[in-house]
């Protein structure tokens, strides 16, 4: 070091990308990679634009054929310390420079697709509409209410993307697809809230005469 100090153990620095798995819907790729725990087909996963993870790595200047060279054998690491930005306003509001993580909120990722019936916005009476976007809006509000049941709890619920078909100002939405991100440090509570959300989706779609599909996005 600049001060002439020699550490008792070697210090290495590693940087992981997309650990939450947003792009290829399976996270912890880098950390699982250095542990030798990648699964078959990992490199063939595609993002929303059809680009494989393998191609993305190559475009970034990486050589996927050298992954094995990056593996750490069990027992070869004495300790691991992760430094991370907060990604939130809590420390700033509390005027604190640093915090120590005591738990991580595991995410539940869902994709919800609602289907109703399209029609002209000016001629279909409100009483007989099957508006998929109205149903989606009520489900989104329900998710927010579910996540806010216990004030101060680390539960968070987010709808980050929403797509409407046919997406025309004068046509009643026939189909809506949106994502759900539900997180909580307490896994039992998250499971309970997931059940509440499923019940809400069922009742809301019945009320608006909609059909629905739900897929859990692997992470």
Give the positions of each predicted feature.
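An extended, acidic, His-containing surface patch that forms the Zn2+-binding/catalytic region
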Residues: 213-219
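Flexible, small-residue-rich helix->loop connector segments that border functional cores
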Residues: 2-10
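A structural signal for isolated positions on well-ordered beta-strands in alpha/beta enzyme cores
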Residues: 12-14, 213
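Short amphipathic alpha-helices in soluble, non-transmembrane regions
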Residues: 192-202
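Short strand-loop-helix active-site module centered on a catalytic nucleophile
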Residues: 1, 13, 136
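Flexible hinge/switch segments at interdomain interfaces of large molecular machines
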Residues: 172-173, 208-210
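Midchain, well-structured core segments that form catalytic/ion-binding scaffolds
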Residues: 19, 23-187
């Amino acid at each position: 070091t600049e001060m002439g100090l020699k550490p008792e153990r070697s210090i290495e620095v590693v940087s992981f990308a997309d650990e939450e798995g947003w792009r290829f819907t399976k996270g912890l790729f880098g950390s699982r990679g250095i542990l030798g725990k990648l699964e078959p087909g990992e490199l063939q996963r595609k993002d929303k634009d059809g680009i494989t993870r393998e191609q993305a790595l190559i475009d970034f200047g990486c050589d996927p054929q050298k992954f094995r060279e990056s593996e750490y054998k069990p027992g070869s690491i004495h300790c691991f310390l992760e430094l991370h930005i907060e990604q939130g306003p809590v420390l700033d509001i509390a005027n604190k420079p640093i915090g120590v993580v005591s738990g991580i909120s595991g995410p539940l990722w869902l994709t919800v697709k609602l289907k109703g019936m399209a029609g002209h916005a000016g001629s279909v009476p409100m009483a007989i509409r099957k508006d998929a976007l109205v149903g989606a809006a009520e489900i989104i509000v329900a998710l927010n209410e579910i996540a806010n049941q216990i004030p101060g709890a680390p539960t968070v619920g987010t709808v980050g993307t929403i797509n409407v078909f046919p997406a025309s100002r004068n046509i009643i939405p026939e189909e809506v697809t949106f994502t759900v991100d539900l997180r909580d440090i307490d896994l039992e509570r998250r499971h309970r809230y997931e059940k509440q959300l499923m019940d809400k989706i069922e009742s809301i779609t019945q009320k608006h005469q909609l059909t629905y599909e739900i897929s859990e996005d692997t992470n």
